[in-house]
């Protein structure tokens, strides 16, 4: 078989058309549609993604682990995930002339086009979906608490209706075209997360000065229950460091040049975000456990009742925050769904396609949130099941494959410590989380 000049010309035209179509797709997909983000966008996007519902569960995790193990787990998790996040920022442009804009693309570079995609994509989607389920539950519970504190005569309204109301709001916000279009929502969410963390800390300290436990034991009446609760506590802490699943996608929105690669402004934002994260986490975890001991609720704000106006304000701030967190995590799901629809199924990119796809996702998340509104168990179960992988050990495995650090060097040791820790969490935490869900389900009535 021979090729003519016309064949070569047609082949070149076909390649140009494919490249043009690919470029058009990237201009429409939410992750790559805009690359005009500033360094501080990455700061508040990361705070919004990280300081989510998980921070309110940290005193509960402390009550399951105790003072020493609880603080060690939080600080160690912060250090490990700070390191693994640095690895991901560095790997974003590790291949010359190419930007790895999405977590699955990084996996493909490390493990191969097919294997890499199927190793990373399902785990990333599970993180995004699990986060949105928890945020839907948290948004509904926080709004209910806010309303009941201000209007006690409305206590009869079911939690289900508040979860539905939160989902209705997400239906509207989910039509935002790309990551940068939700920057105001994300900024407001980041601000709220810091404020309600400080309110929870100050209110807990005030409560503790009036009356606090004389001893600080751990939950559980039997050795078995203590062990399972400890597993759940580890998963809850892992859930609090879930932001890695959106890091590359956030970095993809930042412009990059040979003189100023995207990793420089991105890392600047990450450092600011992680300083805010550890301040919020330690303040809330220590003050909440100090004030309530083993009797703290899985959401520390539920344990706080006075002053009513302050706790109402904190719950409303949580509600505002999880609105933004939901969007940050959902944007990656939207990108995956829409990419599949236009690239594989050959749908034409349109507003109608976006409306149908995103609305379907929000509705399904809401359905699960209504059926399984067990905040504490969800944190532990999902935190161990998939968050430990995407935040703790998967970035380190990819780093070892792509960068090949010298054996027994600092990076080699740090990576292996993170890998062993992450795998241990992945094995133990879901056991405790599932047990907590089963115990909660015994007293739960559907659509209550």
Swiss-Prot record:
Membrane topology: Multi-pass membrane protein
Topological region Cytoplasmic: 1-41, 86-114, 174-183, 244-269, 335-361, 404-411
Domain of life: Eukaryota
Principal location class: membrane
UniProt record, GO biological process: amino acid transport
Spans traversing the lipid bilayer: 42-62, 65-85, 115-135, 156-173, 184-204, 223-243, 270-290, 314-334, 362-382, 383-403, 412-432
Keywords: Amino-acid transport, Cell membrane, Membrane, Transmembrane, Transmembrane helix, Transport
Subcellular location: Cell membrane
GO CC, one annotated term: plasma membrane
The UniProt record lists the keyword Transferase: no
A matching Pfam family: Aa_trans
InterPro entries reported for this sequence: AA_transpt_TM (IPR013057)
Residues in compartment: Extracellular: 63-64, 136-155, 205-222, 291-313, 433-448
Job of this protein: Amino acid transporter.
Family: Belongs to the amino acid/polyamine transporter 2 family. Amino acid/auxin permease (AAAP) (TC 2.A.18.2) subfamily.
Protein name: Lysine histidine transporter-like 5
Species this protein is from: Arabidopsis thaliana
